[in-house]
């Protein structure tokens, strides 16, 4: 009977290539494995290859250094009673190709009206000075070391407080008296009123070499350009992530009489997680075009890094995301650092920690930093203090 079953099983296996056995168990006292000669040869060859790899000589890596026919214009901000800062002047894209002549600059955002809608991690630093733009700017400079201040004239918006251009000029005068750093003067974003406001603000700050923000194709950019020419200011040329739009606007401003040394471009900053790759693409292409000789794009660039706070990950309270006290500044820092590595020269920011860290990082981009003597970090541990447990 058993032989019949075995014979039947063998017939079933005649045309079978493989057998899969489920829930198989084998109890043995001793197991011997025999390797086929081909398997032994494969093992020996593998060992030989590994020995050959380990024996390869080390090769020194030298980063590729390119030379470019063009360079970025240098823009000076701050004259008269102001300290001066310089933007641009680059002759290469990467720091290892050639360090920047001027470090990137961070400017503190200040507003002409209280901003209770700011995220708490920012508001808690400035809640005591929000009623007065002069005090707000003074605190940014004296307590947090701001090298520049951006005064946003939000209150002039028709749907906000509808402050007149003359009232805006008084706010500018107050901030000018409060601090001695260069100013960026921004409007409310209203295309009809902003040129009038910037014109009056430029007059109030005559000779102080401020940056008027901004001129774009949706408003009277000619009026903004004339205000800059008449009162010795520079102009922020704002385009929305479009290289061709940026070229067109720059060309129009140059036709109005501005020089490349009077223009700073803002290609628009999309926040981390909200389209930052578009900004990386446009900013890098813009800088490369400038270095390759496109004179319409040979100006420094600005980043509205404050846009990072519009990301819900920066301010929304959610326990699994971690505390906003850290998350918000980190979101702003990473957004700014990404723009810095892409070629941006000046950053508008909100949080004191973000401003400080990005400024410190920017200083490493300069020739002075790269040629300075650095300490031997291998000796960073000088003493150990421990207790046995």
Swiss-Prot record:
InterPro entries: Ac-CoA_synth_d_su_TIM-brl, ACDS_complex_subunit, CO_DH/Ac-CoA_synth_dsu, Dihydropteroate_synth-like_sf. Pfam families: CdhD (PF03599). SUPFAM superfamilies: Dihydropteroate synthetase-like (SSF51717). One of its GO terms (biological process) is one-carbon metabolic process. Belongs to the CdhD family. Part of a complex that catalyzes the reversible cleavage of acetyl-CoA, allowing autotrophic growth from CO(2). Probably maintains the overall quaternary structure of the ACDS complex. Heterodimer of delta and gamma chains. The ACDS complex is made up of alpha, epsilon, beta, gamma and delta chains with a probable stoichiometry of (alpha(2)epsilon(2))(4)-beta(8)-(gamma(1)delta(1))(8). This is Acetyl-CoA decarbonylase/synthase complex subunit delta. It comes from Methanothermobacter thermautotrophicus (strain ATCC 29096 / DSM 1053 / JCM 10044 / NBRC 100330 / Delta H). The lineage of its organism: Archaea, Methanobacteriati, Methanobacteriota, Methanomada group, Methanobacteria.
